[in-house]
Structures are given as C-alpha cells and as structure tokens.
UniProtKB/Swiss-Prot annotation:
It is an enzyme of class 2 (transferase). Pfam families: 6PF2K, His_Phos_1. It catalyses: beta-D-fructose 6-phosphate + ATP = beta-D-fructose 2,6-bisphosphate + ADP + H(+). It comes from the Eukaryota. One of its GO terms (cellular component) is cytosol. This is Probable 6-phosphofructo-2-kinase PB17E12.14c. Keywords: ATP-binding, Kinase, Nucleotide-binding, Transferase. Signal peptide: none annotated. PANTHER family: 6-PHOSPHOFRUCTO-2-KINASE 1 (PTHR10606:SF32), 6-PHOSPHOFRUCTO-2-KINASE/FRUCTOSE-2,6-BISPHOSPHATASE (PTHR10606). The keyword Transferase applies. Beta-D-fructose 6-phosphate binds at R346.
Amino acid sequence: MSNNNNKDDSELQSRTHYYNPDRTAIPVKDDVDQLDKFGSPKLSANDHSFTNTDSVTSEDRPFSSPVSTLTSNSANFSDSSLQNSPVHPIPSPALSPTLNLGSRPDVKRVSSGGYFALPKQLTSIRQTHRPMSQQHRVPSFHPASDTAPPSPIPFHHHLRKKGSSMSIPGQTSIVSSNNGSEATNPPEEKLAIIMVGLPARGKSYIVNKLVRYYNWLQYNCKAFNVGNFRRKHASHSHDDASFFDPSNEEASKLRESFAMDTLDALLQWFEEEDGVVGIFDATNSTSKRRKAIVDHLSKVPYVTTLFIESICNDEQLIAANMRMKLVGPDYKDLNPEQSLRDFQERVRMYERKYEPLGKSEEDLNLRYIKVINVGKKVVAFNIRGFLAGQAVFFLLNFNLSPRQIWVTRHGESVDNVRGRIGGNAELTPLGRQFSEDLALFIDEKRDEFQERLYNDYSKESHLLQHGSHSFNGKQFETSFNCLTPSENTVNDPQVLDPEDEERLEKPYSVWTSMMQRSIQTAAYFDEEQYDIKAMRMLNEICSGICDGLTYEEIKSIYPKEYEARKLDKLNYRYPGSGGESYLDVIYRLQSVIVEIERMKHHVLVIGHRVITRIIIAYFLGCRREDIAYLNVPLHTVYCIEPQPYGTDFYQYNYDPNTRKFSRVPFSL
C-alpha cells in the first residue's frame, strides 16, 4: 500500500503545473511598464528559466486552455520572489478526482479540470472573467534550460494571413476599417488560359466563346493567337506544311520564338492594361512546350495557369472546321483543292508528336480541362479559383446545335406612353396588337427555319453519296473524311441520321418576366406548341426610389442622382430598397445566358429595355462602355443564330399600319 502511495506521489510530483496568465488580462496601471508589447509580463534570465517543449498535446487540452506543463524536478529558480512562491504539486483529475483546493488565491482552476499555481510576481495582473479564445492560446514552457526565451508571441501573430476570394465586378467591394467606406475591389487573381489541341479541333471557337463570356461578366479578357503573331512577323504571309514539320529544326526554333513572344505580349497586357483573363491560343501540342509555358508564367506570382484541350473525333465536325480553315488567313485566295491537301498534311505533322494532356500535367499538379466534341464530354482536373471555375461551368453548357434565339421588348405599355420608368403597367391597345402579330410572325419564322433544316439535310445526304463539294464556287472531288456538311447540320451530327428525323423538329420556348407588360406580350402564343415560362431574372432593372417617375422628375427631385447616373450609367445603382445597377442585372441574367447557351432548341425572350440591351450585348461581344447605350426601341425583334465561325444577327421592325415585320439592316 505504501509502495503504491509512493508511486502516486512520484507521478504527482512529475506532473506539477503552473499557470501562465492569458492574454486577456488587464494590467494594473502601476504594472504597465512590466509588460511586453503583447500584454505579457516581461521575463528575464534573472526571473526564471523556461523552455518551450510543448509537451501537452491538443488532446490534453480539449478546450484549448492555456495550459503550461512544467516538470518541477528540473526547475531552477534564481529570483527570490519566484523561489518563495507557493508551488503546489497538483495531480491531474485522473490521479486525484476528489482533490479540492477551495478558493485559494494563488491557484486557478481551468476547463480541463486541473489546477495551476500562480507565481507571486504575476498576482498584480487583474484577470478578466472572459473565457480564453482560440486566438489567445499560450505555448507551454518548461524550466529545463538556463536561458529564458522572449515572451511568447500569440498564435495569431505567427499564422494569420490575408485571405483571397472571389472578386465580382459590381458585386464585391473592399470595406475600409477606418471609416467603413467601400472601394472597388479589382480581381487579385489573373488567369492565363493555355489552349491545347490539333488544328481544326475547335480551339478558336472555344476561345472566342470564353472571351465573350468573361468580358460580358466585366472581367477584362483578351485572346493572344500565335498564328496571328506568326503571320504578322513572318517574312511571307503563307507557310506551307513543311514549316510545321517537327524534324525541321530551324522552323521549330522559329515557332518556339513566336510562341514565347506571344506569351510575353500576354504578360505585358496583364501588367499594363489591367488584364484579368488572358488566353494563349496555339496548338501547344507537346509536354515540353507546355512545361516551358508553365516555367515562363511562374515568374509572375499573381498568374494562375489553366490548360484547356479541345479534342474532336467526330469526322463531320473536323470536316466543317477544315472548310473554315480554307477560307481563313492562311489560305485566303489560294486554290481550294491544293489548300485542303496542304492543311491535311499540316495536321499530320502535328499528329506525329502530339501529346494529350494527362499524367505529365497531373504529376506537376497543373490545372486542366479536356473538352471533347464541343462539350459533349468535359474532364476537369485540379480546378481551383473562381475564374477557373467559371470556365468549367461555361464549357459544360454550350453546344453547336442549329437554332434561333429571338429577343424583343414587351409591347407598348401605359407607362411607356407616360414616360415613366419601372412600374407594372399593362399594355396599350397598340401593345396588344404588337403581341398578337408577334405570335404570328414567330410561327412563320419557325416554319421557315424548319424548312431550311430539311433542305440542308437533303443536300448533305446527296453530298455524302456523291463525295463532292465546292469551295468558293469551285467543284472538286474529296475523300469521305473531308466531306463538309453545311454549318447548319454539321453542328449537330445527330440530325444526319435518317432514322432520327424528329430531331429536325426543334422545340420552342417563350420566356417572359414576371411583369404584366411582358406576360401580356406572350398571351397569343399557343401553349400546345410553345413552352411559355415567366422568370423573375428577366424583370426590368429596379429603379428604387425613382420607380414610377419620369426622367424629368428625377432630375428635379434627385438632381445628384440624375447627374451620377449620367456620369457612369453602367455602374450607377439606383438608391432605395432593391435599387439595381446594370452590373447587378448582368449577374442576375448569368443563369439565363448559360441556359440559352445550353439549349439546343429555339427560344424567344420577351424582356425590357435593360434586359434586351444586356442579352444582345453578350452575343455581340460589346465593349462595356457601350452596353448601357444600345438602341433597342419598342416593337423591334432581333434574331440571333449561333454559327461555328461566330454569330449571325438579323433585325425586324414592326409596322403597326401594315401589321407586318420587315427585315432591316442590323443596327444598334
């Protein structure tokens, strides 16, 4: 029994604890000079000797208590005040669960259940009763050395770092802690997108779509095409297939030089023109080239790199892309048959050394996206960052299916006649007439487009059987792999299947806002033939306290607001509950734009002035300074047809006297 007691005493003696005051302590006025800059008592070699050994683990301190564990048998006090301090060996609760020290002033109980002695020198620190926070954890110290360390630096002074998160134009801002004011928050992240892929695989198509999307979201985005740089700086305008032969060392060095010069131009644009997303458009077909690009970009710490590879194994898509190349800058005004053979040879040169994205990039922990057959399959690896995530999101939601996108404003409303903004007015008689004729007009155009699809299908079936086609009006024979269906059918290869002709019958959607004037404009569409849906995202911009006023009334009642709007219409936000800016509406419409890109069928959007401006600005790729000033009058209908080479636009004006829509030159 006595042996057990001695054993317990030994264990108890080896587990002696001391209390080190927390950082929430409030010093007595006379003792301020005895504290260091972190509020801790100043310690010197003459006070005591502590060594930070952190012998207590996080499991020993379940509530992050400021526990300082000290082995008493190695203590070496030189200061008499500390030597005379009552040091009480206190066992842990597991050794003495019934121990009770009452209210002794020199002992403090902590949340883990143990007790700690207060050295006399520290009793002048008046303790607060607030619980210790995680930020004020104190390291453990052991009197196991002859040299006293400096006062321990709190945990947060070691590891606290400024975070970096998404910056959205018009939606995020920097708040100053000094006066609570807000400032614009330019994106800290800059994204360099590096394209990868063989020629005629749709890289430039993806590039153009991404440039338009990022710029529409108000991120400054620009593409840098190595081919354009080569044509601009080469000694002659056309390089035949031999220039792309990997065994041609002189040409290979020249191509590498063009690539690095183009990359330098991208970095210069980042630095000098506040670029946010730069796209490096080239084949970048080998791991060696891609590694050189990463090494080059790594010199700039604020740039994130994302590779996007475009893969296409659909012969019809490749054929269509090849035909587009034959009318491009490398083969313009040249013999089409000879140009086709040269381009095919160029592709074979690249195929000899082509290395797809994969293990080599994964071993380097690089970010990449593989887009297969224009978005039918998308593979993403190690995607991090808001801007890179936007690219993945967008590439998952676009296609090349032939379709029509119609955009118009609602018919004339009562508030339009009165000149009042906002509100929820009904249509005038003229507005209802426009609505009725609009339904008939869309019916007519729907039938015309359907007939065009059938005609194209018949023509392509004939070409597939006879193996001939024409370029620039010249007829020549082609092999099956080089057959080039028309833009309309090749974009959706499934329409070429004779057993699946029902795909030629395109469904149709009609979208309105939640406001009466928009819903009433769709009233004459047959619900059996059109999917009619009202969307709150399509509501007109909310004008806050200016809702229901004319512009003259705003100028008179709120002159400062009137002038502020004139100075910066895109960024100006109407004051008052729910007031919005153009940038607010852009992000409200983001899901609408992505859904339009995703859909393979027709849609008519019946919106409002700001809504129509923003949607058309997206498809046109308008500059940010032009978006808020596009001319989109009432009773004008816009038709948008996505194509592999871009977008076709048509404009139709309504004549209320003849009740007809006539096509006019597109203008905004």
